[in-house]
Amino acid sequence: MPASPIRKLVPLAEAARARGTKIYHLNIGQPDLPSPQTGLDALKKIDRTGLEYSPSDGYRSLREKLVGYYEQFQIKLSPDDIIVTTGGSEAVLFAFMSCLNPGDEIIVPEPAYANYMAFAISAGAVIRPVVSSIEQGFALPDVAEFEKLINDRTRGILICNPNNPTGYLYTRKEMNRIRDLVKKYDLFLFSDEVYREFIYTGSPYISACHLEGIEQNVVLIDSVSKRYSECGIRIGALITKNRTLRNAVMKFCQARLSPPLIGQIVAEASIDAPRSYSTEVYEEYIERRKCLIDGLNRLPGVYSPIPMGAFYTVARLPVEDSDDFCAWCLSDFDYEGETVMLAPASGFYSDPACGRNEVRIAYVLKKEDLERALVVLGKALEAYNNRK
């Protein structure tokens, strides 16, 4: 089981904090913005004498509320197409466990969310990467690169759209090419779409559920964590119109009994948040994105493409080993009592050499803190490269 590139440096961060160093956390996608007041109010108003199990697929009232939410994005579902999970992570794990046998393979564009590898290992499956490049803005590689990897053990393709860690947004043309491949070889399409509300270019959001002819192949992964700043309530969803697959997933759901009761109450109420909440959050991330990307590309030797969605970027640094640099920032560096914590990009590739001089940066800090973090990062790079 690989260590998380997002969390593996935590012991060094704790030691730095114990020394009195202030850390700017650019390493993890933990939104710092308030959760919807509707959700917080629902939490405060819980008046129960017991906290019982919920149904294994989640409360129907929440699933009905989610149907209405997805309708805003032209995704037509019924409550029975939705299974509430303990975060989006459990949705990915249950999807893999239900669709893949040991030794089966899934094709994944990389860099990719690091925990996909851990979930594949848990299912006994093998990830076959198709590597995108920072020079091309992490655009989807040519479909021919996918087709080269397909064999009799290939069971699916996994995408994240908008992408974590790169912020790339798939075009309609790219999604149609994936659809054609899924249809041709009768593969599952696992589509992680938790960042759909964070698209900054005016480009359309193309869901896997919008693709005609593969309705039985699509497994949509979702979560309330990012759009409502509710990572801690651990509520996600696995969505499929494939009844055979749903029945298989439900066996895993029944084995873990139920998704979190209190989390479901908060999530259901959060869906009722006024549109102004989403608008304010969206506008804040637009400002942060501009601040971060402009600032990164002004630093000597640093390059970041402009992310189209989510709230991450993968940047190339003027270092040979970003793992070493990120650890050094916490163990051996501070500038005026401050340092930065980054996620080495090597952990987002199957072959760590692919991201050796790259880092993932999350812009989940207020603009003033991002500006200061960029100053500290610049000083860190200068000091690191001037070591004797």
Model-identified regions with their sequence ranges:
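Generic structural signal for well-ordered alpha-helical scaffold segments
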Residues: 14, 67, 71, 96-97
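P-loop/Walker A NTP-binding region and its immediately flanking N-terminal helices
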Residues: 48
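PLP-dependent class I/II
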Residues: 2, 9, 16-24, 28-45, ...
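Conserved N-terminal alpha-helix of the aminotransferase class I/II PLP-enzyme fold
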Residues: 53-86
